[in-house]
Amino acid sequence: MAEFDVTIEILSPIHLSSGRADVNVDAEIVHDALGFPYFPAKRFKGLLYESAVEVLEMFELSRLDAENLSPLEKIFHRHSTSEVQLIVPNFYILPAEKYQAFCAEWKYLQGVYPEIFTPTEILNSYTSLRYQTKLENGIAAEGSLHNLRVLDAGTKFFGKITLLNADKKVLNVLALAIKNLTAAGMKRNRGFGRIKCTANIPFPQFLFKEA
């Protein structure tokens, strides 16, 4: 078994949709019961798979030898199973061991001062609302104004991924996929969702071998 610390840094406003809305927000982001945003495990794993596919495509287009990279099916089990297991947690604003104590303190404060330390106020401190509308002939279309909540740039998320029965080729794929993962969430083509991912996985040395 091997464990690796992963950090996700938000470089531009990002919308990680929860699929929910209310009278004030048309598109809400994921957050916990206390109001703190987090990066869902399933979403990160899906993005990691997409990034790994891109890595293999880049190797193919560049005519680089991919023999040091593990087949993706061995890691992500899209259509089959294998002994390799990739365990991905939710990513929180603090490492897991610190986040639990942090949440316990906030629960206490919310219990003692419920009118001050509300989930909404906490969420607002990490986020902002963006408004958009549809234009028709240069004029805003009636009823087209809506908003979405975005997580502000500068936020960092922390998590620890676990690998079972992994070999060097699996580690190579993960290291490259994490390095290549630079976008998440909605409206990526409009400047939203830029991220930087880092992990304490050794970078593949075969890439630096002389030809």
Identify the residue ranges that each predicted region occupies.
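RNA-binding basic/glycine-rich loop and surface signature characteristic of RAMP-family CRISPR effectors
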Residues: 1-126, 140-211
